[in-house]
Amino acid sequence: MITKVSGFLFRTFREDPATTESRGYGFLLRAGYIRQTGSGIFSWMPLGLKVRHKIENIIRYEMGQVNAIEVLFPALFSADLFKQSGRWSEYGDDIFRLKDRRQGDYLLAPTHEEAFTQMMKEICTSYRDLPRTVYQIQDKYRDELRPRAGLLRSREFSMKDAYSFDLDEKGLRQSYEAQKRAYKKIFDRLKIDYVIVKANAGAMGGSVSEEFLHPTEMGDDTFVVTADGSAFNAEVYVTPPGPAIDYSNAPEAEDCETPGVISIPDLVNHMNSSGRFIGRVIESSDCLKCLLFRIEYAEVQNGNPSNLVVKKILERGFEYIGFLVPGDRNVDLKRAQVALSPLTIEPADNRVFECNPSFVRGSIGPGLSGVFYCADPRVSLGSSWIIGANRPGVHRIGAIAGRDFSFDCTLDVSSIKTGDKSEWGPVTVKRGIEIGHLFQLGLKYSNALGLKVLDKDGYNKAVFMGSYGIGVSRLFALIAEKNCDERGLKWPAVLAPFDLHVVLLSSARAELIDSLTDCGLDVLVDDRRVSPGVKFTDAQLIGVPKIIVIGDKTRGEDVEVWDRANDQRTVLPLKEMIQGVIQGVIQGVIQGVIQGGDTGGDTGGDTGGCTER
């Protein structure tokens, strides 16, 4: 098929928009693959749609290989099902809510567990109807607080979500593993690096959850790799508790004047220059800081949360939470939010301190009224710390946990650092972007929505469910980010919007294009009346892997072939070039399928491991 640029919906730009946060995102905008229409909202242009459809078709093929059946649900749903499952409240402000003219509650679905469950409830009545795995590729909606990085964190995004339905837990595990294998094949064919990590189920619910993370410093997910190869999202990583220490002979805690000290570095410098610690250097890790947050009470289903820490907070009506963490650490807000779900927390601002005179900046410590204290696991019984004394310019030295101060619970929410000790040895901390997520939901939605079938003995039995998501638009953005240089995009052949990009420089040789008509390739011909420099610049920006230059420098059937992957140029007869491209396309498809079948390297299984490809 021949597509001429002169008749195509197409425009390129020479400069990145001011809001561009990454090189690949900038090229997608400049080359006209997508257009931003609002904060976190994008239009897909013809070039972008062609690449997106190729990604979707690879996903469809691999879903078909594990007998998953495609359907398509609406994005707009009545809130009734979501209220039944509890997610209407559990999702908080992350969902778009709206009302119809009769004041009925509706939402733009972030995922479709409830809809799939209701559909299967109406279709499946017997054990003979199971197992089934059903999926869709559809746009989803989440009210992101801070959309960023283009398609990587947007309010509207394309996603493949699949759901499995099984009669028992064994069947669920089999369906889960089938989807996991399919995901490996998909990402291998797309040549996307990934790590499989143990993850938090969050508002989705269920017992077992794993993420496919693409390692990149652009990522907003932190994951931990242990010495034995196990990998965990930081949200679920468990810090080993510090050992209990005998403090029977420990000296009494002392108050120390610390005028002007408002930070941990100030406190460390003051202590080391005070002369109190002869022969010892005080470090940040010797100090225990209290980070104060304001608690925002979200609606809690039935008023009886399963989270025991949250239950304590609700029962006693605390307004504030104080995290006691070593001075060389900070609170990881994502870990804290997971640990305290469905409550939300916000750092204490100036107004909090103005309304609470007992909250002394720089000297906050344990013991304040109205504060629920959560201590880091390293704050073990008998451990000694330098703490704030809750008085201006005063700290306490040698305060013993369990003797001089107490706390309401131990909560593992502090930041994790490379080199931290674990039961598997030192850990390595990395960043990544989630590209896939697997959940064993169990009976959560089946019980909530009444999905049951008759078993062999004629008894009603709740159906076990799994949920499996892939971010399609996010994959598109990551592939662009990975495949570019300083001049533009460099799409792999299997995903490129066209097989060939012809730069026509000589109208006298335009008849050569006719021989491309029936070759079976998808060809973009730049026939515009613009300078050669503009055409070459746009060809590099768009990133089709093979650029064919038809100009006066070659004669007869010869054309200049420009390989965008390595920027090498050769002169070949047109027919030979066409055959080479066709063979490359065929070989790329075959190789992708074969590579997709290789599941080697997974050390995870049910026990959880790290697969890095």
From Swiss-Prot:
GO terms for cellular component: cytosol. Its main location: cytoplasm. Its EC number is 6.1.1.15. Gene3D superfamilies: Anticodon-binding domain, Bira Bifunctional Protein, Domain 2. GO terms for biological process: prolyl-tRNA aminoacylation. InterPro entries: aa-tRNA-synt_IIb, aa-tRNA-synth_II, aa-tRNA-synth_II/BPL/LPL, Anticodon-bd, Anticodon-bd_dom_sf, Pro-tRNA-ligase_IIa, Pro-tRNA-synth_IIa_bac-type, Pro-tRNA-Synthase_IIa_type1. It comes from the Bacteria. It is found in: Cytoplasm. It catalyses: tRNA(Pro) + L-proline + ATP = L-prolyl-tRNA(Pro) + AMP + diphosphate. PROSITE patterns: AA_TRNA_LIGASE_II. SUPFAM superfamilies: Class II aaRS ABD-related, Class II aaRS and biotin synthetases. It is an enzyme of class 6 (ligase). Keywords: Aminoacyl-tRNA synthetase, ATP-binding, Cytoplasm, Ligase, Nucleotide-binding, Protein biosynthesis. Transmembrane segments: none annotated. Catalyzes the attachment of proline to tRNA(Pro) in a two-step reaction: proline is first activated by ATP to form Pro-AMP and then transferred to the acceptor end of tRNA(Pro). As ProRS can inadvertently accommodate and process non-cognate amino acids such as alanine and cysteine, to avoid such errors it has two additional distinct editing activities against alanine. One activity is designated as 'pretransfer' editing and involves the tRNA(Pro)-independent hydrolysis of activated Ala-AMP. Homodimer. This is Proline--tRNA ligase. It comes from Tropheryma whipplei (strain Twist).
